[in-house]
């Protein structure tokens, strides 16, 4: 295969491992056993490659191909002093590492620099092209459902526009593995062969355009800007390139790259952006040399394949001149020039691909082809699968219409060939995707119609899954997003334990949370998906497999007391008062216990003496139904501090280790009283093998919980109080007038309180996708709004281009920006210049996180502008409701425009009185600061009714001590024409 000119070879530096140390392939493999339950997978980890060529990682095979002339000691190697030469006989399959903005990452890949040369021209390597355009894939288990959906959307995008096919791997030797590695976005170029090859989708790389770009490398593309003819089309601005990254802009020699006759493509998804590896975000490193349609063409897009990308891929994989990939749930296609006959020597292929779990009905509505024995000359052929070697369902010619064809899976291959000109019509066919059906396999995938895009309205799909006798059916959800409703009345997925609609109901599911794993009691499981005619969501993706219950065997998996079956495995556990022995099967006596009294006490082992090392004690406290348990510590002393890494006490609502956590405590500070969420509580004490302390003593008591029965009648959250309860709604909802139900609130908020808390929608759960919320905060005039972040967990991106919170210094989004925030690092407090602040939160349709929690308050002082319109200024934010607080010092600078002075009119003035105004006072200065002439210090009943400045500004200072407080002051200010002299009137 000639190396396709959409990724650079980057002949920057070849970095070798230490001389004298043999290469061990085990050093460059990564175990996927924990990521994929189907089987352990080993592939070479590009982050541990044997060598690097610029930002390209090389393995042993690549090293042999490159015939390296010189080795370099890694320990002695420095980025600026190395000079290594390599012979490059051909285009090899080498990983290219790239970050979220189209730039190679400065990490394990592409971190060394130097000089190199090629002694021989690149040769054609046809083995790097995927045979028949079929690329098997595996997605590692460490990705979320939304990430998997993005990967599938990107693969379907390539399939839609080319003849490449991405197929879930079964037993193929060569395939790609989507995984998460430190290299960031990193993938091999072309087919490596001889086993799996990694495509790393690292941190912040899980965006549609970025994944499409990385799949371009898998298909066989190099970066566009390294073509030999690039200097005719773009200029490299070398003075703007980051030091040490210049080698990323080398171009390839004419004999090293094959552009397949395509012109330079500014719009290619494989092109670097204008500021790639730039010293600054606004400095260009690549600039187009000429205009296209009157403007300089944009470069570096990560939105979709360009026309040039599509044309080049179709040439590389020798796609038929006619035909296409059909992915809609219904559609039609016909022979060329239908119904006016077709030309000789035509070859067309249509690939029909619908959602896994669906089948295809293909119906020929018109057929008029040259008839021959065995349809030898002109024919249309249908195969039951994804390629030309799939099982043949029929070869047709003549004019007799075939019976409708139903696929056994979600793909059909339709091929048309002609050998002569024919005056007949040709053919016309229609197809439709049908969901549901009988699934008799031990392993497989089922997805909602049209997944990962929104499912279709008014669909009813029923799947009957059957695995081998003697096994159970296991279900694991990869992704789940179905229209939410409290009782799943509209759209839902229903799962039943059997093979019919009358079987035992396991659950009816909707919303955005993935259901727990499901296991049938027999070898059959029944699934039903229903959508109504209105709101459509992304749907679901689920894996099914045969599952055996080890705990049902006579020896209960070898467990002495309890055996807990899990999907794909099992684990042993012990009764309360016992703990697992080191062999993880036997149980031995332990501290703790199972307590059902309404009140009592618990202590650490050995109390009141020091507790022993290596103890693990669990107390399970259970009260009657409708009661809650409160735990109060009388004494507390354990090893540790805030980290609680060594010895600690952990308190949870519930009886299991994954119940709601109230707190993890250590050190010498007594925890506050803890009240359980339900009628049970779990208290766990752990000590390590080093320092021991006195431990703890605590007592517990019970109180009736009205929320435990029918949630107190509350639709969402019920909060128990001693002797009563109250209903509350989550963020994004408000309480109904009946004080029990919740109704959805708008996401545009007006906040007028002087202080409070603001959270992202659905806090503390993940915020929904495609959401935009605003908060317009207004405070008392003269007091600036201050925003302090308590928690921050928003999808991260260097420029916060995806999900983000934006803060504006004013009443709306037209005001100056104070900051745009994302990621998990808490921003510093944000302070407005005035009494208004505007917040806007935005989420896209992919990754969701917990969101943010922030408090807003006020800070006195600042600069305000006076004009002809009268404005107000108050001594404190809660003026009229409370006295001013003690211990404050505030300064306001009131500024008028040039040629105007400032007029102050006091409406209210009540400040602690003292002869010299030495305690609380207001002070006025005729200027910007306290060096200006002082107009006076006032307390008690206050200054004159009106005050005029001699200049264009007035400084107002207010001070209070920490004792007596009063009502404060309220003044109004305007701008006036300058007076000849400063004066005041009463």
Curated annotation (Swiss-Prot):
Residues the record lists as binding Zn(2+): 213, 217, 223
Chain positions with Omega-N-methylarginine modification:
934, 937
InterPro entries of this UniProt entry?
Answer: BMP_1/tolloid-like (IPR015446), CUB_dom (IPR000859), EGF-like_Ca-bd_dom (IPR001881), EGF-like_dom (IPR000742), EGF-type_Asp/Asn_hydroxyl_site (IPR000152), EGF_Ca-bd_CS (IPR018097), Growth_fac_rcpt_cys_sf (IPR009030), MetalloPept_cat_dom_sf (IPR024079)
Instruction: Give tissue specificity per the record.
Output: Ubiquitous.
Segments forming domain Peptidase M12A: 121-320
Q: What is the effect of changing residue 45 to H?
A: In a breast cancer sample; somatic mutation
Disulphide linkage map: 163-319, 183-205, 185-186, 322-348, 375-397, 435-461, 488-510, 551-563, 559-572, 574-587, 591-617, 644-666, 707-718, 714-727, 729-742, 747-773, 800-822, 860-890, 917-939
Pfam families tied to this protein: Astacin (PF01400), CUB (PF00431), EGF_CA (PF07645), FXa_inhibition (PF14670)
How is the activity of this protein regulated?
Activity is increased by the procollagen C-endopeptidase enhancer protein.
Catalytic activity of the protein: Cleavage of the C-terminal propeptide at Ala-|-Asp in type I and II procollagens and at Arg-|-Asp in type III
Q: Which residues form the active site?
A: 214
Q: Where in the cell is it found?
A: Golgi apparatus, trans-Golgi network; Secreted, Extracellular space, Extracellular matrix; Secreted
Alphabetically sorted, this entry's keywords are: Calcium, Chondrogenesis, Cleavage on pair of basic residues, Cytokine, Developmental protein, Differentiation, Disease variant, Disulfide bond, EGF-like domain, Extracellular matrix, Glycoprotein, Golgi apparatus, Growth factor, Hydrolase, Metal-binding, Metalloprotease, Methylation, Osteogenesis, Osteogenesis imperfecta, Protease, Repeat, Secreted, Signal, Zinc, Zymogen
According to the record, cofactor stoichiometry and binding are noted as: Binds 1 zinc ion per subunit.
Q: Which Gene3D superfamilies match?
A: Collagenase (Catalytic Domain), Laminin, Spermadhesin, CUB domain
Carbohydrate attachment residues: 91, 142, 332, 363, 599
**Polar residues: compositionally biased ranges:** 90-104
Q: What does this protein do?
A: Metalloprotease that plays key roles in regulating the formation of the extracellular matrix (ECM) via processing of various precursor proteins into mature functional enzymes or structural proteins. Thereby participates in several developmental and physiological processes such as cartilage and bone formation, muscle growth and homeostasis, wound healing and tissue repair.
Which clinical disorder is mentioned?
Answer: Osteogenesis imperfecta 13: An autosomal recessive form of osteogenesis imperfecta, a disorder of bone formation characterized by low bone mass, bone fragility and susceptibility to fractures after minimal trauma. Disease severity ranges from very mild forms without fractures to intrauterine fractures and perinatal lethality. Extraskeletal manifestations, which affect a variable number of patients, are dentinogenesis imperfecta, hearing loss, and blue sclerae.
Q: Which PANTHER family match?
A: COMPLEMENT COMPONENT 1, S SUBCOMPONENT-RELATED, CUBILIN-LIKE PROTEIN
Entry protein name = Bone morphogenetic protein 1
Name the gene. Answer: BMP1
């Amino acid at each position: 295969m000639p190396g396709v000119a959409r990724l650079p070879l980057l002949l920057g530096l070849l970095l070798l491992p230490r001389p004298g140390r043999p290469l061990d392939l085990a050093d460059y493999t990564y175990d996927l056993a924990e990521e994929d339950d189907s089987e352990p997978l080993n592939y070479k980890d590009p982050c541990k490659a044997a060598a690097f060529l610029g930002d390209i990682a090389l393995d042993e095979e690549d090293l042999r191909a490159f015939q390296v002339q010189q080795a370099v000691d890694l320990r002695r190697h420095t980025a600026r002093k190395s000079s290594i030469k390599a012979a490059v006989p051909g285009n090899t399959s080498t990983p290219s590492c790239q970050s979220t903005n189209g730039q190679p990452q400065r990490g394990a890949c592409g971190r060394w620099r130097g000089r190199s040369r090629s002694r021989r021209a690149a040769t054609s390597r046809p083995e790097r092209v995927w045979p028949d355009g079929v690329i098997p894939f595996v997605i590692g288990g460490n990705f979320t459902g939304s990430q998997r959906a993005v990967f599938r959307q990107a693969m379907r995008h390539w399939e839609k526009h080319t003849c490449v096919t991405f197929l879930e791997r079964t037993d193929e030797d060569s395939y790609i593995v989507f995984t998460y590695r430190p290299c960031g976005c990193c993938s091999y170029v072309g087919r490596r062969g001889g086993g799996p090859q990694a495509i790393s989708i690292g941190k912040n790389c899980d965006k549609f355009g970025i994944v499409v770009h990385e799949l371009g490398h898998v298909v066989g593309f190099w970066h566009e800007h390294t073509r030999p003819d690039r200097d005719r089309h773009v200029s490299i601005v070398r003075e703007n390139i980051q030091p040490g990254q210049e080698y990323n802009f080398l171009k390839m020699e004419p004999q090293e790259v094959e552009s397949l006759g395509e012109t330079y493509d500014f719009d290619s998804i494989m092109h670097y952006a204008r500021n790639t590896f730039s010293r600054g975000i606004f400095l260009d490193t690549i600039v187009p040399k000429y205009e296209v349609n009157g403007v300089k063409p944009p470069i570096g897009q990560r939105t979709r394949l360009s026309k040039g990308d599509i044309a080049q891929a179709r040439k590389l994989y020798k796609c038929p001149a006619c035909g296409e990939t059909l992915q809609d749930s219904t559609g039609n296609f016909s022979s060329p020039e239908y119904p006016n006959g077709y030309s000789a020597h035509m070859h067309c292929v249509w690939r029909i691909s619908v959602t896994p779990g669906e089948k295809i009905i293909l119906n020929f509505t018109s057929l008029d082809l040259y008839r021959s024995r065995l349809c030898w000359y002109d024919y249309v052929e249908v195969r039951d699968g994804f390629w030309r070697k799939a099982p043949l369902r029929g070869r047709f010619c003549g004019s007799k219409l075939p019976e409708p064809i139903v696929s056994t899976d979600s793909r059909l291959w339709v091929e048309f060939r002609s050998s002569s000109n024919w005056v007949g019509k040709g053919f016309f066919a229609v197809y439709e995707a049908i969901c549901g059906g009988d699934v008799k396999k031990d392993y497989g995938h089922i997805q909602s119609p049209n997944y990962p895009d929104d499912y279709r309205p008014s669909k009813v799909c029923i799947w009957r899954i059957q695995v081998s006798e003697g096994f159970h059916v296991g279900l694991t959800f990869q992704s789940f997003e179905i229209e939410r409703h409290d009782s799943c009345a509209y759209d839902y997925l229903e799962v039943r334990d059997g093979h019919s609609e009358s079987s035992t109901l396991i659950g009816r599911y909707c919303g955005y949370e993935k259901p727990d794993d499901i296991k049938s009691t027999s070898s059959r499981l029944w699934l039903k998906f229903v959508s109504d005619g209105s709101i459509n969501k992304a749907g679901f993706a689920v894996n099914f497999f045969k599952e055996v219950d080890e705990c049902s065997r006579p020896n209960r998996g070898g467990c002495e007391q309890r055996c807990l079956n899990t999907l794909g495995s099992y684990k042993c556990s012990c009764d309360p008062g016992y703990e697992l022995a080191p062999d993880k099967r036997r149980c031995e006596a332990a501290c703790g216990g199972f307590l059902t009294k309404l009140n009592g006490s618990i202590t650490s082992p050995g109390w009141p003496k020091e507790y022993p090392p290596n103890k693990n004690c669990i107390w399970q406290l259970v009260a009657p139904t409708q009661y809650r348990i409160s735990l109060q510590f009388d004494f507390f002393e354990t090893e540790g501090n805030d980290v609680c890494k060594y010895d600690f006490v952990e308190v949870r609502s519930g009886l299991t280790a994954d119940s709601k956590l109230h707190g993890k405590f250590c050190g010498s500070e007594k925890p506050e009283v803890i009240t359980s969420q339900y009628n049970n509580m779990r208290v766990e004490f752990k000590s390590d093998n080093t320092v021991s302390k006195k431990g703890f003593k605590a007592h517990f008591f019970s109180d009736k919980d009205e929320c435990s029965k029918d949630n107190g009648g509350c639709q969402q959250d019920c909060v128990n109080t001693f002797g009563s309860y109250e209903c509350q709604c989550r963020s994004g909802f408000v309480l109904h007038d009946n004080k029990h139900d919740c109704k959805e609130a708008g996401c545009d908020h007006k906040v007028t309180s002087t202080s409070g808390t603001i959270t992202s929608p659905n806090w503390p759960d993940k915020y929904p996708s495609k959401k935009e919320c605003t908060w317009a905060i207004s405070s008392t005039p003269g007091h600036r709004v201050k925003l302090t972040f308590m928690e921050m967990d928003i999808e991260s991106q260097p420029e916060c281009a995806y999900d983000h919170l934006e803060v504006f210094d004013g009443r709306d989004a037209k005001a100056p920006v104070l900051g745009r925030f994302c990621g998990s690092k808490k921003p510093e407090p944000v302070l407005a210049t005035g009494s208004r602040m505007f917040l806007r939160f935005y989420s896209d349709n992919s990754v969701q996180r917990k969101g943010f929690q922030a408090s807003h308050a006020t800070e006195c002082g600042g600069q305000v502008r006076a004009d002809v319109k009268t404005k107000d200024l108050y001594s404190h934010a809660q003026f009229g409701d409370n006295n001013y607080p003690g211990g404050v010092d505030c300064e306001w600078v009131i500024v008028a425009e040039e040629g105007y002075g400032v007029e102050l009119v006091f409406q209210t003035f009540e400040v602690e009185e003292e002869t010299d105004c030495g305690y609380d006072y207001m002070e006025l200065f005729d200027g910007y600061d306290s060096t200006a002439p002082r107009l006076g210090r006032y307390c008690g009943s206050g200054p004159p009714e009106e005050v005029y400045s001699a200049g264009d500004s007035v400084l107002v200072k207010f001070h209070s001590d920490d004792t007596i407080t009063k009502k404060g002051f309220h003044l109004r200010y305007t701008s006036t024409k300058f007076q000849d002299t400063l004066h005041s009137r009463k």
